[in-house]
Amino acid sequence: MSMRDGALRNDEAYGAHPRHRLDLYLPESEGSERPIFVWFHGGGFVRGDKQHRANIGAWGAREGFVTVLPNYRLAPACRWPSGAEDVVAVWAWLRANAQHVGGDAESIVLAGESAGAAHVAAATLMRRLQPKDWNIAGAALLSGPYNPLLEGRARTQFGIATPDPRNEPYFGTDLAGWDAASVVDHVDAAPFPLLIAYAERDLVQMQVQAGELFARLVSRHGFDPELRFLSAHDHFSAGASLGTEDTSVSRELAAFVKRCAAG
């Protein structure tokens, strides 16, 4: 595989499943060993597509990042921990192909929103899901659910329907099995640069879990994550704003990626 600066490469296969496809957006400027920024879309574990966030691919390339938008397997056909496994598979593909896309294999920053953030959180914070050579420059989590067991036990307070149209297709119907998938309760990764963001008009359960994850990482695991409150944004608008005149999110995110790449 060979690519030129400024190219857009669609549907590169990073695995055998039909959903194992990614799009690559490369900067127009000359250079090599650029930061690699990966964005995993949302969709409540059951839907979503990389093309829905093409704005982020274009934005990242303009910022000078090799920007990667993957699809991943969806529920109910594929259940926990398939999403996290796909995050790891994308990472492995990028490590193997970094030189061909002008990226730095040591400067991979993984990011996601909503369900995509949940998958990135699991892959980066739960060591049992990682290969022995796992290494990333950082991760950014936007408006994600990180504790499905809490959501299951507090459905009434959070206003979540029964049956749960989002969690049950991915985690199953037995709450007893949701504990193993609750990232908040099973963090065992060594600290790395991490940004946790939630929106002012986010779903209440997302706001609660952002704070819960932040507190647990700081108090028990030695992390020093950045915490960002996205004023005037809702669950969907933060990702949609990247590449627009609204730079309230993109400015913070670009600066974070550059700090991660600088080490």
Regions from the language model: what does each represent?
Residues 1-263:
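Alpha/beta-hydrolase superfamily serine-hydrolase fold, recognizing
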